[in-house]
């Protein structure tokens, strides 16, 4: 029997690495002929990444995680944005990726008991410089896109936008409605190197043999049809939702806090708690924290608030506060003691699955949106960075699957007032029956897509047929 090896590599962010690892897990479980090697890239500024990798390596079957040697980071004068840094950082790993692939090819060739073939390498959205290595070694290369299909379409269309125009709205084929300039990513609006790198990667996407997207046909029907109409693209495979449903519960950096959170949730009524969580890279300034606190207190809803301190350095993740009283209004914790819990890092996937949780104030990272839809928990949108403003716009305006607190918020430039927070929370937790119904329907649809003969299941079968042909 011929066996197949697939290789994956992603930038060192949880939002990109985790879904890629889960896709490798899905692929190898679906077809036991496949095994996977994940090439991981370390960043000393992000120890949480190493915690995840070590935990996943010990629990993964048929998946091997291989740490690439550490390389010198790009010099500060070489980049202006995080995407610029990450793109160059991945480019600097070319030699080590080539060495790893050559070793894998030698191993597969020397396997006398079974025929083993290196079937493909999957790069992520900011690792396209590694397509050169795949081409040099004649290894089929695919793109694994961890963001929505709408974001992929926007990125591919980016070169045709004239941002010097004074237009406030743009026609973007992957969106049903005109897309406001105000929800464009900061990378595009800032006069830095972000647009260059996004356009560079978009051009290279078209060199891959196919694009695997963490979405499903029934969720992003319009965007996926738009991509299908692009004759320059190879086949697109929507195979989601790909989720780590255990999440950080299996590698939580603070097990005592995890226990405290879950015990508190166990004591709350059904669907009564709103989770406020802004992702692994999300944090807010002190004046915004104060407005949220006032809005929460006025709304009177039960809440679990993952409140984290802004990073001290550019490439670091936020960290837990030593004392939340340092940033919250005087007496807030005491006044809300009976209805709320303020904490640091939360095991988001497990919390969203808890029966007490009935709403989610989210930064609208795509993984978080998919988790909320899977568990049937309605979202109130509060985007912070990356493509999250566009995700929020799509969820609220195009799909009608979310309540709006903001769709175009930007840290440091905007302030959502306590009244807006209060109104958004009330709408999410005490109204929004139509959105709640639609989210529950989409939850059932997400689960059905992964079952035999479901849309994502069928696309995975088609991908496997191509990989093994």
Curated annotation (Swiss-Prot):
Inhibited by Cu(2+) or Zn(2+). Gene3D superfamilies: Glycogen Phosphorylase B. SUPFAM superfamilies: UDP-Glycosyltransferase/glycogen phosphorylase. The keyword Transferase applies. Pfam families: UDPGT. UDP-alpha-D-glucose binds at residues 280, 345-346, 363-371, 385-388. InterPro entries: UDP-glycosyltransf_plant (IPR050481), UDP_glucos_trans (IPR002213), UDP_glycos_trans_CS (IPR035595). Its EC number is 2.4.1.-. Keywords: Glycosyltransferase, Transferase. It comes from the Eukaryota. GO terms for molecular function: UDP-glucosyltransferase activity. PROSITE patterns: UDPGT (PS00375). Optimum pH is 8.0. Glycosyltransferase that catalyzes the C-glucosylation of daidzein to puerarin. Shows activity with the isoflavones daidzein and genistein, but has no activity towards flavonoids such as 2-hydroxynaringenin. Can use UDP-glucose, but not UDP-galactose or UDP-glucuronic acid as sugar donor. Does not require bivalent cations for activity. Belongs to the UDP-glycosyltransferase family. This is UDP-glycosyltransferase 43. It comes from Pueraria montana var. lobata (Kudzu vine). The gene is UGT43.
């Amino acid at each position: 029997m011929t066996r197949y090896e697939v290789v994956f590599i992603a930038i060192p962010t949880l939002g990109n690495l985790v879904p890629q690892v889960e896709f490798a897990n899905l692929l190898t479980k679906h077809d036991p002929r496949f095994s996977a090697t994940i090439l991981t890239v370390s960043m000393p500024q992000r120890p949480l990444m190493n915690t995840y990798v070590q935990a996943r390596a010990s629990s993964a079957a048929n998946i091997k995680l291989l740490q690439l040697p550490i390389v010198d980071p790009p010099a500060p004068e070489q980049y202006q944005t995080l995407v610029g840094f990450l793109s160059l950082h991945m480019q600097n790993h070319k030699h080590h990726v080539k060495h790893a692939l050559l070793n894998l090819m030698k191993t597969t060739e020397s396997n006398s008991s079974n025929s083993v073939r290196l079937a493909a390498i999957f790069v992520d959205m900011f690792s396209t410089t590694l397509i050169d290595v795949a081409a040099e070694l004649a290894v089929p290369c695919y793109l694994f896109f961890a963001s929505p299909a709408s974001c992929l379409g926007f990125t591919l269309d980016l070169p045709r936008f004239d941002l010097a125009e004074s237009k406030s709205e743009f026609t973007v084929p992957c969106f049903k409605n005109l897309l406001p300039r105000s929800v464009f990513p900061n990378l595009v609006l800032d006069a830095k190197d972000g647009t260059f790198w996004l356009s560079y990667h978009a051009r290279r996407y078209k060199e891959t043999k196919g694009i695997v997207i963490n979405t499903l046909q029934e969720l992003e029907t319009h965007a996926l049809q738009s991509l299908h109409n692009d004759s320059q693209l190879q086949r697109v495979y929507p195979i989601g939702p790909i989720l780590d449903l255990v999440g950080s519960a299996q590698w939580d950096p603070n097990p005592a806090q995890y226990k405290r959170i879950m015990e508190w949730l166990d004591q709350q009524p059904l669907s009564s708690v709103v989770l406020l969580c802004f992702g692994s890279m999300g944090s807010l300034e002190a004046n915004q924290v104060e407005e949220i606190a006032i809005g929460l207190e006025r709304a009177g809803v039960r809440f679990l608030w993952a409140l984290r301190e802004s990073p001290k350095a550019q490439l670091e993740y936020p960290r837990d506060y030593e004392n939340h009283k340092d940033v919250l209004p005087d007496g807030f914790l005491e006044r809300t003691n009976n209805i709320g819990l303020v904490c640091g890092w939360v095991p988001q996937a497990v919390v969203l699955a808890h029966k007490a949780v009935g709403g989610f104030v989210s930064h609208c990272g795509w993984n978080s949106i998919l988790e909320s839809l899977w568990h049937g928990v309605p979202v109130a949108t509060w985007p912070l960075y990356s493509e999250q403003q566009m995700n929020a716009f799509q969820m609220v305006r195009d799909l009608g699957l979310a309540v709006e607190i903001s769709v175009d918020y930007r840290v440091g430039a905007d302030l959502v007032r306590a009244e807006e927070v209060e109104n958004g929370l009330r709408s999410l937790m005490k109204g929004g029956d139509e959105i709640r119904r639609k989210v529950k329907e989409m939850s059932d649809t997400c689960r059905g897509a992964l079952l035999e003969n479901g849309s994502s299941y069928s696309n995975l079968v088609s991908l496997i047929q191509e990989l093994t042909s």
